[in-house]
């Protein structure tokens, strides 16, 4: 379970970064 929690946190951070990048790209386009 601890390893899964760690993976979930890493995945969450990756999702946050990807979302931020996508929002920044959209902001640059608009």
Swiss-Prot record:
One of the record's GO cellular component terms: chloroplast thylakoid lumen
Alphabetical UniProt keywords: Chloroplast, Plastid, Thylakoid
Keyword Chloroplast belongs to the record: yes
Domain of life: Eukaryota
Keyword presence, Plastid: yes
Subcellular location: Plastid, Chloroplast thylakoid lumen
Family classification: To A.thaliana At4g02530.
Protein name: Thylakoid lumenal 13.3 kDa protein
